[in-house]
Curated annotation (Swiss-Prot):
This is Contactin-associated protein 1. The chain crosses the membrane at residues 1284-1304. Residues 540-577, 957-996 form the EGF-like domain. Residues 1356-1368 have a biased composition (Pro residues). Residues 576-795 form the Fibrinogen C-terminal domain. Residues 1305-1384 are cytoplasmic. The keyword Transmembrane applies. Glycans are attached at residues 120, 128, 276, 420, 499, 518, 597, 653, 664, 763, 804, 843, 860, 948, 956, 1078, 1147. It comes from Homo sapiens. A motif (SH3-binding) lies at residues 1328-1369.
Length: 1384
């Protein structure tokens, strides 16, 4: 990124060089001109004269009616750089031009057509008389004269034009070379050492070959620009070195038919190895070969040819003949130095400073009925005609002439690239012969034809020995007219009858009967006649440069079109864009193929080529097998970490990028790798960097081996602790003098395929290693299921579409909405008020529309359905394509709707706005529904990765999982598929299509099962310690398993129940890398049925004294026992016996000191542990079912109920994320060593569902529910409006009752309490010696508190409180209010 910024800054700096500064070059050029600088072919009246043809003028230019070739011409008085052109119709009229052609030149008798991108010479004009339409040209040309040729205008009016040109003055320093001269430029410091360079100049010539520029250095650096076959070649090298493996030479070609005597603009920008090569506005970007970044040039640079001793090095190259203008090298104008004869310039020969080549006067034949008729000298006995022509067409009429005295006619035609001569005379056999070969190559060819009595001669290009002479009895009398390029219509009027089509191309130097035709007189209609031609210009251009045919398709062109031949490319279509082969073996399987070799194209229409693979097609999947050159064991010795062995893997018929595209598009890939060693280590080193490793996709190094997982530097034996040395993680790391092997499958898709194997520890005398790699095997297509749902007015934004000349879009949609935009991308304006765009939308429920503007105005294709509507909530496939030849649209299997593109079309697909998926720009016309498998030019958009629920989108298509026909029971996860859904039961204790099949086992007396938790947890921690996306324990508020899954059916808690907001154990926390088990909580659920007691149903032991147990007591009741820390906890689960042989269910969840319990359909109860009880079940060890066979100290209460063991059925057992019965009955045999160690069963254990019935579509009625309790524990479940009304009624009655009680309480207790008054006593009562008064009332007695049910009663009553002191004298006369005691 830093290099890119520097490159842009340097380009901006060097672009300010003299003659190449574009900044501020936007002056209006027509307005300041004098009236004499504006001319025209004719004008309609004085008020429509050319001098009024200025923007925003009071009138405008209009030619006279009947002008066959109208034009408006501007003389800028000196050379200018033109960057934009603008047009306007005539003021206050119906006159405007809708299409026109732009010609430019340095002289009034030599014109060059300006071609837009796509070699289109036609500009869009106006749609009314007032609006100004401006075109910013894709490259800036230089000229003094500008000519506008109207091609179409308003049919309700006539031609009307006001013109504006934008640019700036231009200083031209011209060098003319005649093929024998050249100049050299000596560098200021004798050498040039540069990280960046800019070469820029203009040239014109009529020669096909010539050296334009050359410089070289002593270290092998050089840069050369030359013409070869009228193509411009750039040769560049930044040097080569014997120790560098890659050569530095790079050659790039640009353009075609550059010998057309038109100015061509060349620019080369280099920064390091990054190069931009520009020719006439077309930019090629490439990276130079080699490893160096500086260009080291010695002494001098040569222009136009070589000087002195330098000719010996490039003696086979021709010097340039023509004109070169403004040669710029790193802000130095070498042409200016040459004009000023600077001392650093050396001349070879006589270099002129103006163009001396004769100015050609060609005729451009470009119409369907074009021709030029010139008079001849009649009744001569010798017919002599010569001319020069150039064309791309295979056929065309070159010349037709009627012989005098009715003797017949002479016809020269172009057929299959050669000139055919036909002389027809009455009464004689027609004379026919041909000359030349491949004359339709776009170059000038000269034809000389002479016919006289009894013989005819034709020669092509004056090649000696190439003329064709024919002797035949002929009688020649010249006629009065010669028709070049075609016959006029109607032919009978002109007496020109030919079955050949009109010629399209250029002609010049026409000679009739030895006289050169004055084309100036012909143009002014003072000699002969013409139609649909342009004088003084040749509009030939190379439509195959750049090549519009993709994937190495061959381009063949005509005058106004091109054709692509796609044989042997693996593609088809108008531009070889559509893939011929399917993208995977899975696609061949779905089409009914059987196993065999097939050609696949994983990236579709993308740049990667198709290749051959072997398809192992089976009933349910198709394996794609890609073989390579390392299928046999490779022996390695003598390598070290400093100089390792690099074992590159060359896949058959495919490059690394192509195989990577296959893996990237596959659902699953695997590749077996095996390393055998003898005193050779593999991964373990002291510094951490391995001795050996493998390299995968994108040249990334990977330090894990087969059978292991990414991110951990281990082999397969390091995961299950089965390595030779337990302290190491690979067998080979033991470094023993005997053969060891580490092997296994590599299955992480994003790392495959293996491209190199690096071996680095075989340099000891006894060391040796061998490695072996099996073919890459893949199946599935993960791109086809990349699905998203749009719920509201939402849209996804992606980077703009990057398409050169073609675009194809395909996707599936499903909706019930009547309309919506699937995708839209807008671009910057290609002219003043037009913006390119592409849009695919559901316009109505029966119409899918593909709308676009790629430079030719608004277009759209529509697929209409008469038999059904597209918003039927079913999947429909949409495919839309557009290229320079045509646009087409298809929905499902309906026929393609086609729209041919106009000839000479450029597909303007330069988009600078984000690509909107799900709506139009600014979220207009949003789509509501599902989209999947959206591809643009072979690249699949990651729709799921952009889904955001807060913005109205979600991954997958929620049509099935939101309203499933059958939900996923017991916390199973609903997985959306193409036209169905599946249930993922991996994290449940059940299986079946809907996670509704109970998995249980019948325990005989003495049968027990142990599941080693610590072993399983250690294995899980090892396997997923470096994978963040794998669920690992954590916390989430208010969570019950499965409640976050669409279609979840509650289990024992009842519908809609959620636990309080406590942290839930076992929930994933992003980035958590600790132990897999959370000791602060458990989740236990299971079902059982039995008729015997006592028994231990479930027991969890630990490495300390902590445990958890669910047991059946002697009386048949259920009890839960916990030992957390030092304080035991006992809770009686039921008070009734459960040994009735009926199924019973238990669900226990502990979070810290909060315990939630539910048995059968009893209400959920919540218990809280005392603060004296620990909140952690420390160091869990094993899970026992049926009987406890634990070594060490066991709680005596557990021992009491442990004999003789459980006899009955247990099912659906789940402890956190462990389901031991499911693991035992559903794990394929043989088990892995680790799982076999963790799981142990003693006695007879047979599978049984314990009498459970699978879930049905609706809730099972109580009378049929096997889990239903006896009648003394009724359970009511009301639904519908009756339940709602009943609830409202009950609530109203309860509220009324509560209100009455409140009113009664307030009324009864409003005046409750005692109001005590101490009256004044008699005087004698205060006399000394009198008896003290008795207290009127004693202190209030505090009632003894009642003991709680679980608390022991107090041993003795609390002592009475001390009486309050008697009131003082001052308070004896005050009233005292004593509140009523609580006992009242």
């Amino acid at each position: 990124m830093m290099h890119l910024r520097l490159f842009c800054i340097l380009l901006a700096a060097v672009s300010g060089a003299e003659g190449w500064g574009y900044y501020g070059c936007d002056e209006e050029l027509v307005g300041p001109l004098y009236a004499r600088s504006l001319g025209a072919s004719s004008y309609y009246s004085l008020l429509t004269a050319p001098r009024f043809a200025r923007l925003h003028g009071i009138s405008g230019w209009s030619p006279r009616i009947g002008d066959p070739n109208p034009w408006l011409q501007i003389d800028l008085m000196k050379k200018h750089r033109i960057r934009a052109v603008a047009t306007q119709g005539s003021f206050n009229s119906w006159d405007w031009v809708t299409r026109y052609m732009l010609l430019y030149g340095d002289r009034v008798d030599s014109w060059t057509p300006f071609y837009q991108r796509g070699h289109n010479s036609t500009f869009f004009g106006n749609v009314n008389e007032s609006a100004v339409v401006r075109h910013d040209l894709h490259f800036h040309f230089t000229a003094r004269y500008i000519r506008i040729v109207p091609l179409a205008w308003n049919p309700r009016g006539k031609i009307g034009l006001r013109l504006g040109l934008y640019g700036c003055p231009y200083k031209a320093d011209i060098l003319y070379f005649d093929g024998d001269d050249a100049i050299s430029y000596r560098f200021p410091r004798g050498v040039s050492r540069s990280l960046w360079d800019v070469f820029a100049f203009s040239f014109k010539t009529e020669e096909k070959d010539g050296l334009l520029l050359h410089a070289e250095g002593a270290q092998g650096d050089y840069v050369t620009l030359e013409l070869e076959g009228a193509h411009l070649l750039l040769h560049m090298s930044l040097g080569s070195s014997p120790i560098q493996p890659r050569p530095g030479h790079t050659t790039v070609s640009a353009g075609g038919v550059l010998n057309d005597q038109h100015w061509h603009y060349v620019r080369v920008d280099r920064f390091g190895r990054d190069v931009n090569f520009t020719l006439d506005g077309y930019v090629q970007r490439f990276i130079l070969n080699g490893d160096f970044e500086r260009l080291n040039l010695d002494t001098e640079m040569f222009i136009g040819g070589l000087v002195g001793a330098a000719r010996k090095n490039l003696a086979y190259r021709h010097n340039f003949r023509g004109c070169i203008e403004n040669v710029i090298f790193n802000r130095v104008n070498i042409a200016d130095l040459a004009v000023r004869r600077h001392s650093r310039i050396t001349f070879e020969g006589k270099v002129a400073f103006r163009c001396l080549d004769p100015v050609p006067h060609p005729i451009n034949f470009g119409g369907p009925h074009n021709f030029v008729q010139v008079p001849g000298f009649p009744r001569r006995g010798r017919l002599a005609v010569s001319f020069r022509f150039r064309t791309w067409d295979l056929t065309g009429l070159l010349l037709f002439s009627r012989l005098g005295d009715g003797l017949g006619h002479v016809e020269l035609t172009l057929s299959e690239g050669q000139v055919n001569v036909s002389i027809a005379q009455s009464g004689r056999k027609k004379l026919q012969f041909a000359a030349g070969y491949r004359l339709n190559d776009g170059f000038w060819h000269e034809v000389n034809f002479v016919a006289q009595e009894n013989h005819a001669v034709i020669s092509i290009d004056d090649v000696e020995g190439a003329e064709v002479r024919v002797s035949y009895p002929l009688l020649i009398r010249t006629g009065t007219s010669y028709f070049f390029g075609g016959c006029p219509k109607p032919a009978s009027r002109w007496d020109c009858h030919s079955n050949q089509t009109a010629f399209h191309g250029c002609m010049e130097l026409l000679k009739v009967d030895g006289q050169l035709v004055n084309l100036t007189l012909v143009e002014g209609r003072r000699l002969g006649f013409y139609a649909e031609v342009l004088f003084d210009t040749c509009g030939i251009t190379d439509r195959c440069s750049p090549n519009m045919c993709e994937h190495d398709g061959r381009c063949y062109q005509s005058w106004d079109d091109f054709i692509c031949y796609c044989e042997l490319t693996g593609y088809k279509g108008e531009t070889c864009h559509t893939p011929l082969y399917k993208e995977s073996c899975e696609a061949y399987r779905l089409s009914g193929k059987t196993s065999g070799n097939f050609t696949i194209d994983p990236d579709g229409s993308g740049p990667l080529k198709p290749f051959v693979v072997y398809c192992d097609i089976r009933e349910n999947r198709a394996w794609t097998v890609v073989r390579h050159d390392r299928l046999w064991t490779t022996r390695v010795t003598g390598s070290s970490m400093e100089r390792p062995f690099l074992g590159a893997i060359q896949y058959w018929n495919a490059s690394w990028e192509e195989v990577s595209a296959l893996a990237n598009a596959s659902q699953h890939c695997e590749q077996w790798i095996e390393f055998s060693c003898y005193n050779s280590r593999l991964l373990n080193t002291a510094g951490g960097y391995p001795y050996s490793f493998w390299i995968g996709r994108n040249e990334e190094q990977h330090f894990y081996w087969g059978g292991s997982q990414p991110g951990i530097q281990r082999c397969a034996c390091g995961l299950d602790r089965s390595c030779v040395d337990p302290a190491l993680y690979c067998n080979c790391d033991a470094d023993q003098p005997q053969w060891r092997t580490d092997k296994g499958l590599l299955t992480f898709v994003d790392h495959l395929p293996v491209t190199q194997v690096v071996i680095g520890d075989t340099n000891r005398s006894t060391s040796e290693a061998q490695f072996f790699l099996r073919p890459l095997r893949c199946y599935g297509d993960r791109n086809s299921w990349n699905t998203i749902s749009f719920h509201t007015g939402a849209a996804l934004r992606f980077p703009p579409i990057r398409a050169n000349h073609s675009l194809d879009v395909s996707f599936y949609f499903r909706t019930s909405a009547p309309s919506g935009v699937f995708l839209e991308n807008m671009g910057g304006p290609y002219c003043q008020w037009r913006r390119p765009y592409v849009r695919v939308e559901l316009n109505t429920s029966r119409d899918v529309v593909f709308a676009f503007d790629v430079g030719n105005g608004d277009e759209n294709l529509t697929v209409h359905s008469d038999d059904f509507e597209f918003n039927d909530d079913e999947w429909h496939l949409v495919r839309a394509e557009i290229n320079v030849k045509q646009a087409r649209l298809r929905v499902d299997h309906r026929p393609w709707v086609l729209r041919p593109m106009p000839l000479q079309t450029y597909i303007w697909m330069e988009y600078d706005q984000p690509l909107y998926v799900g709506s139009a720009e600014l979220k207009r016309r949003p789509f509501v529904g599902c989209l999947r498998a959206m591809r643009l030019n072979g690249v699949t958009l990651n729709l799921e990765g952009r889904a955001n629920a807060s913005e109205g989108t979600s991954p997958n298509c929620t049509g099935h999982c939101a309203h499933p026909r059958l939900p996923c029971f017991h916390g199973g996860r609903c997985v959306e598929r193409y036209s169905y859904y599946t249930c993922d039961c991996d994290l449940t204790a059940f299986d079946g299509p809907y996670c509704n099949h109970d998995i249980g086992g019948f325990f005989e007396p003495g049968t027990w099962m142990r599941y080693n938790l610590q072993s399983a947890l250690r294995s899980a921690a090892r396997e997923f310690s470096h994978m963040l996306s794998r669920p690992v324990p954590g916390y989430e508020p208010g969570y019950i398993p499965g409640y976050d899954t669409p279609g979840y059916v509650p289990g024992y808690h009842g519908p809609g129940y959620r636990l309080p907001d406590y942290p839930r154990p076992g929930r994933p926390v992003p980035g958590y890398r600790g132990p897999v088990y959370n000791v602060t909580g458990e989740e236990v659920s299971f079902s059982f049925s039995t008729s015997s007691a006592p028994a231990v149903l479930l027991y969890v032991s630990s490495f300390v004294r902590d445990y958890m147990a669910v047991l059946i007591k002697d009386d048949g009741t259920l009890q839960l026992r916990y030992q957390l820390g030092t304080s035991p906890y006992v809770y009686q689960l039921t008070t009734r016996p459960v040994t009735d042989g009926q199924p019973h269910s238990i669900n226990i969840t502990r979070v810290y000191r909060n315990l939630f319990i539910q048995v059968d359909y009893f209400p959920l109860t919540e218990q809280k542990f005392s603060l004296l009880v620990d909140s952690q079940l420390d160091s869990p060890k094993a899970l026992y079912l049926g009987r406890v066979m634990e070594t060490g100290v066991i709680d005596p209460e557990i021992q009491r109920y442990n004999t003789p063991g459980f006899s009955g059925c247990l099912s659906g057992v789940r402890f956190n994320n462990v389901a031991p019965l499911k693991t035992h009955f559903r794990t394929p045999r043989p088990m892995t060593a680790e799982l076999a160690e963790a799981l142990r069963v003693q006695g007879e254990l047979s599978e049984s569902n314990c009498g459970a019935m699978p879930r049905l579509v609706s809730e099972v009625p109580p009378e049929l529910d096997p889990w239903y309790l006896p009648p003394d524990f009724p359970y009511y479940h009301d639904e519908g409006w009756v339940a709602i009304l009943l609830g409202f009624l009950v609530a109203f009655l309860l509220l009324g009752l509560v209100g009455m009680l409140v009113l009664f309480y307030l009324q009864n207790h409003r005046y409750k309490g005692s109001y005590h008054t101490n009256e004044p006593k008699a005087a004698h009562e205060y006399h000394p010696g009198s008896k003290p008064p008795l207290p009127t009332s004693g202190p209030a007695q505090v009632p003894t508190p009642t003991a709680a049910p679980n608390q022991a009663p107090a041993s003795a009553p609390a002592p009475a409180p001390t009486p309050a002191p008697a009131p003082g004298p001052r308070d004896q006369n005050l009233p005292q209010i004593l509140e009523e005691s609580r006992s009242e």
